[in-house]
Amino acid sequence: MWGETFDDFENDEGEMAMAKQNLIAEPARADFTFAKLPLGIQPVDFMKTHFAETAGKSMQFRKGTTTLAFVYEPATPADKGGIIVAVDSRASSGEYISSKSVMKILDIGDRMVATMAGGAADCQFWTRIVAKYCTLYELREKTSITVSAASKYFANTLYGYRGQGLSVGSMVAGYDKKGPQIFKVDSEGDRCQLKVCSVGSGSLNAYGILDNHYKPKMTDDEARKLGLRAIMHATYRDSGSGGVCNLCHITPTEKIRLPPMDVSKLWYEFADELGRDITYNPVE
Protein backbone atom coordinates (compact mmCIF):
# COMPACT_ATOMS: atom_id res chain seq x y z
CA MET A 1 0.00 0.00 0.00
CA TRP A 2 1.02 3.60 -0.54
CA GLY A 3 2.95 5.10 2.37
CA GLU A 4 4.33 1.78 3.62
CA THR A 5 8.09 1.33 4.05
CA PHE A 6 10.34 -1.68 4.58
CA ASP A 7 10.29 -0.96 8.36
CA ASP A 8 6.62 -1.90 8.40
CA PHE A 9 7.61 -5.47 7.43
CA GLU A 10 10.50 -6.00 9.87
CA ASN A 11 8.49 -8.55 11.85
CA ASP A 12 7.52 -10.54 8.80
CA GLU A 13 10.41 -11.57 6.56
CA GLY A 14 8.06 -13.12 4.00
CA GLU A 15 6.04 -9.96 3.47
CA MET A 16 9.22 -7.87 3.36
CA ALA A 17 10.74 -10.05 0.67
CA MET A 18 7.54 -9.91 -1.37
CA ALA A 19 7.41 -6.10 -1.04
CA LYS A 20 11.02 -5.78 -2.22
CA GLN A 21 10.31 -8.09 -5.15
CA ASN A 22 7.32 -5.99 -6.19
CA LEU A 23 9.38 -2.79 -6.04
CA ILE A 24 12.27 -4.06 -8.15
CA ALA A 25 10.13 -5.91 -10.68
CA GLU A 26 10.45 -4.75 -14.28
CA PRO A 27 7.64 -2.47 -15.43
CA ALA A 28 5.03 -3.93 -17.70
CA ARG A 29 5.65 -3.43 -21.39
CA ALA A 30 3.60 -0.55 -22.82
CA ASP A 31 0.83 -1.56 -25.15
CA PHE A 32 0.67 0.83 -28.10
CA THR A 33 -2.27 0.75 -30.47
CA PHE A 34 -1.55 2.14 -33.91
CA ALA A 35 -4.05 2.99 -36.60
CA LYS A 36 -4.37 0.35 -39.29
CA LEU A 37 -3.28 1.06 -42.84
CA PRO A 38 -5.99 1.59 -45.46
CA LEU A 39 -7.19 -1.53 -47.23
CA GLY A 40 -5.10 -2.48 -50.22
CA ILE A 41 -1.87 -0.83 -49.02
CA GLN A 42 0.87 -3.27 -48.00
CA PRO A 43 4.13 -1.32 -47.50
CA VAL A 44 6.33 -4.43 -47.44
CA ASP A 45 4.94 -5.74 -50.73
CA PHE A 46 5.16 -2.26 -52.24
CA MET A 47 8.85 -1.96 -51.34
CA LYS A 48 9.65 -5.42 -52.72
CA THR A 49 7.84 -4.69 -55.97
CA HIS A 50 9.36 -1.27 -56.62
CA PHE A 51 12.75 -1.25 -54.89
CA ALA A 52 13.96 -4.86 -54.58
CA GLU A 53 17.14 -5.95 -56.37
CA THR A 54 15.06 -7.50 -59.15
CA ALA A 55 12.97 -4.34 -59.66
CA GLY A 56 15.78 -2.50 -61.42
CA LYS A 57 15.21 0.72 -59.46
CA SER A 58 17.36 2.41 -56.85
CA MET A 59 15.84 3.56 -53.59
CA GLN A 60 15.75 7.27 -54.39
CA PHE A 61 12.38 8.60 -53.36
CA ARG A 62 11.12 11.47 -55.49
CA LYS A 63 9.56 14.25 -53.49
CA GLY A 64 6.66 16.44 -54.54
CA THR A 65 4.80 19.45 -53.21
CA THR A 66 3.45 22.87 -54.09
CA THR A 67 3.89 25.93 -51.91
CA LEU A 68 3.35 29.58 -52.80
CA ALA A 69 3.28 33.02 -51.26
CA PHE A 70 2.70 36.55 -52.54
CA VAL A 71 2.47 40.09 -51.22
CA TYR A 72 -0.44 42.36 -52.11
CA GLU A 73 -1.75 45.76 -51.13
CA PRO A 74 -5.38 46.32 -50.06
CA ALA A 75 -7.64 47.48 -52.88
CA THR A 76 -10.21 49.13 -50.59
CA PRO A 77 -10.11 50.61 -47.07
CA ALA A 78 -12.07 47.58 -45.86
CA ASP A 79 -9.30 45.18 -46.91
CA LYS A 80 -6.24 44.36 -44.81
CA GLY A 81 -3.67 43.38 -47.43
CA GLY A 82 -0.51 41.56 -46.42
CA ILE A 83 0.74 38.13 -47.45
CA ILE A 84 -1.08 35.03 -48.67
CA VAL A 85 0.67 31.70 -48.06
CA ALA A 86 -0.94 28.60 -49.60
CA VAL A 87 0.26 24.99 -49.68
CA ASP A 88 -0.98 21.49 -50.49
CA SER A 89 -0.90 18.66 -47.93
CA ARG A 90 0.51 15.60 -49.74
CA ALA A 91 3.73 13.87 -48.70
CA SER A 92 5.03 11.45 -51.32
CA SER A 93 7.91 8.99 -51.47
CA GLY A 94 8.30 8.31 -55.14
CA GLU A 95 5.17 6.51 -56.29
CA TYR A 96 4.00 5.99 -52.72
CA ILE A 97 1.74 8.60 -51.09
CA SER A 98 2.89 8.51 -47.48
CA SER A 99 0.48 11.14 -46.12
CA LYS A 100 -2.44 13.27 -47.25
CA SER A 101 -2.59 15.63 -44.29
CA VAL A 102 0.82 17.24 -43.80
CA MET A 103 0.83 20.83 -42.52
CA LYS A 104 3.45 22.60 -44.62
CA ILE A 105 2.99 26.05 -43.06
CA LEU A 106 5.10 26.11 -39.89
CA ASP A 107 5.03 28.91 -37.34
CA ILE A 108 8.22 30.86 -36.65
CA GLY A 109 6.76 33.88 -34.85
CA ASP A 110 3.52 35.69 -34.15
CA ARG A 111 3.35 37.03 -37.70
CA MET A 112 5.95 34.89 -39.43
CA VAL A 113 5.80 31.42 -41.02
CA ALA A 114 8.00 29.09 -43.06
CA THR A 115 6.85 26.66 -45.73
CA MET A 116 7.99 23.09 -46.38
CA ALA A 117 9.27 21.79 -49.71
CA GLY A 118 11.80 18.98 -50.04
CA GLY A 119 12.48 16.42 -47.34
CA ALA A 120 9.87 16.63 -44.59
CA ALA A 121 12.33 15.71 -41.82
CA ASP A 122 14.91 18.29 -42.94
CA CYS A 123 12.33 21.07 -43.26
CA GLN A 124 10.67 20.38 -39.93
CA PHE A 125 13.94 20.05 -38.01
CA TRP A 126 15.64 23.17 -39.34
CA THR A 127 12.48 25.23 -39.10
CA ARG A 128 12.29 24.36 -35.40
CA ILE A 129 15.90 25.51 -35.04
CA VAL A 130 15.03 28.84 -36.67
CA ALA A 131 11.91 29.23 -34.52
CA LYS A 132 13.98 28.61 -31.38
CA TYR A 133 16.54 31.19 -32.47
CA CYS A 134 13.80 33.77 -33.13
CA THR A 135 12.27 33.18 -29.70
CA LEU A 136 15.63 33.52 -27.95
CA TYR A 137 16.37 36.69 -29.92
CA GLU A 138 13.09 38.28 -28.85
CA LEU A 139 13.67 37.33 -25.20
CA ARG A 140 17.22 38.69 -25.25
CA GLU A 141 16.67 41.86 -27.28
CA LYS A 142 13.14 42.65 -26.05
CA THR A 143 11.98 43.24 -29.62
CA SER A 144 10.60 41.17 -32.49
CA ILE A 145 13.05 39.79 -35.02
CA THR A 146 12.66 40.93 -38.61
CA VAL A 147 11.78 38.59 -41.45
CA SER A 148 15.07 39.47 -43.13
CA ALA A 149 17.11 38.51 -40.06
CA ALA A 150 15.23 35.23 -39.55
CA SER A 151 15.68 34.21 -43.19
CA LYS A 152 19.37 35.20 -43.09
CA TYR A 153 19.95 32.99 -40.05
CA PHE A 154 18.09 30.17 -41.83
CA ALA A 155 20.23 30.53 -44.96
CA ASN A 156 23.50 30.78 -43.01
CA THR A 157 22.66 27.64 -41.04
CA LEU A 158 21.86 25.64 -44.17
CA TYR A 159 24.99 26.96 -45.91
CA GLY A 160 27.09 25.35 -43.21
CA TYR A 161 25.66 21.95 -44.17
CA ARG A 162 25.71 22.34 -47.97
CA GLY A 163 26.75 19.26 -49.90
CA GLN A 164 25.70 16.91 -47.10
CA GLY A 165 22.44 15.75 -48.64
CA LEU A 166 19.94 18.15 -47.09
CA SER A 167 16.74 18.75 -49.06
CA VAL A 168 15.15 22.06 -48.09
CA GLY A 169 13.26 24.55 -50.22
CA SER A 170 11.50 26.98 -47.93
CA MET A 171 9.89 30.39 -47.96
CA VAL A 172 10.08 32.61 -44.88
CA ALA A 173 7.13 35.01 -44.99
CA GLY A 174 6.02 37.52 -42.43
CA TYR A 175 5.08 41.04 -41.45
CA ASP A 176 7.48 43.26 -39.49
CA LYS A 177 8.33 46.95 -39.10
CA LYS A 178 9.46 47.05 -42.73
CA GLY A 179 6.14 45.68 -43.96
CA PRO A 180 5.30 42.35 -45.64
CA GLN A 181 8.32 40.38 -46.83
CA ILE A 182 8.97 37.00 -48.46
CA PHE A 183 12.38 35.32 -48.68
CA LYS A 184 13.13 32.09 -50.52
CA VAL A 185 15.76 29.88 -48.85
CA ASP A 186 17.17 26.53 -49.99
CA SER A 187 19.54 23.86 -48.70
CA GLU A 188 22.51 25.33 -50.61
CA GLY A 189 22.29 28.53 -48.58
CA ASP A 190 20.76 30.62 -51.36
CA ARG A 191 18.45 33.43 -50.24
CA CYS A 192 16.48 35.95 -52.27
CA GLN A 193 13.59 38.31 -51.64
CA LEU A 194 10.50 38.06 -53.86
CA LYS A 195 7.02 39.51 -54.12
CA VAL A 196 5.57 36.38 -55.72
CA CYS A 197 7.15 32.98 -55.09
CA SER A 198 6.34 29.31 -55.53
CA VAL A 199 8.47 26.30 -54.55
CA GLY A 200 8.00 22.61 -55.26
CA SER A 201 7.37 20.16 -58.07
CA GLY A 202 4.05 21.84 -58.86
CA SER A 203 5.46 25.37 -58.82
CA LEU A 204 5.37 25.76 -62.62
CA ASN A 205 1.63 25.11 -62.63
CA ALA A 206 1.14 27.52 -59.74
CA TYR A 207 3.21 30.18 -61.51
CA GLY A 208 0.98 29.83 -64.56
CA ILE A 209 -2.02 30.94 -62.50
CA LEU A 210 -0.13 33.57 -60.50
CA ASP A 211 1.44 35.19 -63.57
CA ASN A 212 -1.96 35.55 -65.23
CA HIS A 213 -4.11 36.65 -62.30
CA TYR A 214 -1.81 38.29 -59.74
CA LYS A 215 -2.26 42.03 -59.20
CA PRO A 216 -0.31 44.25 -56.79
CA LYS A 217 -3.62 45.53 -55.39
CA MET A 218 -6.42 43.10 -54.60
CA THR A 219 -9.24 42.63 -52.17
CA ASP A 220 -8.75 40.05 -49.44
CA ASP A 221 -11.26 37.71 -51.09
CA GLU A 222 -9.53 37.98 -54.47
CA ALA A 223 -6.14 37.25 -52.92
CA ARG A 224 -7.38 34.22 -51.02
CA LYS A 225 -9.17 32.81 -54.07
CA LEU A 226 -6.01 33.30 -56.14
CA GLY A 227 -3.96 31.28 -53.65
CA LEU A 228 -6.54 28.51 -53.52
CA ARG A 229 -6.88 28.37 -57.30
CA ALA A 230 -3.13 28.20 -57.90
CA ILE A 231 -2.76 25.29 -55.48
CA MET A 232 -5.80 23.56 -56.97
CA HIS A 233 -4.36 23.69 -60.51
CA ALA A 234 -1.00 22.45 -59.28
CA THR A 235 -2.56 19.43 -57.57
CA TYR A 236 -4.35 18.46 -60.78
CA ARG A 237 -1.25 18.72 -62.98
CA ASP A 238 1.43 17.46 -60.60
CA SER A 239 1.36 13.91 -59.22
CA GLY A 240 3.44 14.90 -56.19
CA SER A 241 0.87 17.44 -54.99
CA GLY A 242 -2.60 16.82 -53.61
CA GLY A 243 -4.76 16.49 -50.53
CA VAL A 244 -6.20 19.73 -49.21
CA CYS A 245 -5.19 23.36 -49.55
CA ASN A 246 -4.05 25.05 -46.35
CA LEU A 247 -3.99 28.84 -46.51
CA CYS A 248 -2.58 31.44 -44.13
CA HIS A 249 -3.25 35.18 -44.39
CA ILE A 250 -0.70 37.38 -42.61
CA THR A 251 -1.96 40.93 -42.04
CA PRO A 252 -0.30 43.90 -40.30
CA THR A 253 -1.98 42.90 -37.02
CA GLU A 254 -2.59 39.14 -37.05
CA LYS A 255 -2.01 35.75 -38.65
CA ILE A 256 -5.20 34.11 -39.93
CA ARG A 257 -5.33 30.39 -40.75
CA LEU A 258 -8.26 29.41 -42.93
CA PRO A 259 -9.92 25.97 -42.70
CA PRO A 260 -8.50 23.34 -45.10
CA MET A 261 -10.18 23.24 -48.51
CA ASP A 262 -10.51 19.98 -50.45
CA VAL A 263 -8.88 20.47 -53.84
CA SER A 264 -11.55 18.31 -55.52
CA LYS A 265 -14.29 20.66 -54.33
CA LEU A 266 -12.23 23.62 -55.52
CA TRP A 267 -11.94 22.00 -58.95
CA TYR A 268 -15.71 21.66 -59.30
CA GLU A 269 -16.25 25.24 -58.09
CA PHE A 270 -13.78 26.46 -60.69
CA ALA A 271 -15.52 24.46 -63.41
CA ASP A 272 -18.89 25.95 -62.42
CA GLU A 273 -17.46 29.46 -62.72
CA LEU A 274 -16.36 28.67 -66.28
CA GLY A 275 -19.65 26.98 -67.09
CA ARG A 276 -17.80 23.78 -67.91
CA ASP A 277 -19.35 20.36 -67.30
CA ILE A 278 -16.61 18.04 -66.05
CA THR A 279 -18.89 15.22 -64.94
CA TYR A 280 -17.76 11.88 -66.31
CA ASN A 281 -20.48 10.36 -68.51
CA PRO A 282 -19.22 7.18 -70.19
CA VAL A 283 -20.63 6.47 -73.61
CA GLU A 284 -22.43 3.15 -73.75
Curated annotation (Swiss-Prot):
Annotated GO biological process: proteasome-mediated ubiquitin-dependent protein catabolic process
Description of the deletion phenotype: No visible phenotype. Constitutive skn-1-dependent expression of the proteasomal subunit rpt-3. Double knockout with ddi-1, sel-1, sel-9, png-1 or skn-1a results in failed expression of the proteasomal subunit rpt-3.
Gene3D superfamilies: Glutamine Phosphoribosylpyrophosphate, subunit 1, domain 1
A single cellular component GO annotation: proteasome core complex, beta-subunit complex
Subcellular location, record wording: Cytoplasm; Nucleus
GO molecular function per UniProt: endopeptidase activity; threonine-type endopeptidase activity
EC number: 3.4.25.1
Pfam families noted in UniProt: Proteasome (PF00227)
UniProt enzyme class: hydrolase
Residues making up the propeptide: 1-64
Signal peptide: none
Reactions listed under catalytic activity: Cleavage of peptide bonds with very broad specificity
InterPro entries in alphabetical order: Ntn_hydrolases_N, Pept_T1A_subB, Proteasome_sua/b, Proteasome_suB-type
Active site per the UniProt annotation: T65 (nucleophile)
Transmembrane portions of the chain: none
Assembly with partners or alone: The 26S proteasome consists of a 20S proteasome core and two 19S regulatory subunits. The 20S proteasome core is composed of 28 subunits that are arranged in four stacked rings, resulting in a barrel-shaped structure. The two end rings are each formed by seven alpha subunits, and the two central rings are each formed by seven beta subunits. The catalytic chamber with the active sites is on the inside of the barrel.
Family recorded in the similarity comment: Belongs to the peptidase T1B family.
Protein's name in the database: Proteasome subunit pbs-5
Protein species of origin: Caenorhabditis elegans
Recorded name of the encoding gene: pbs-5
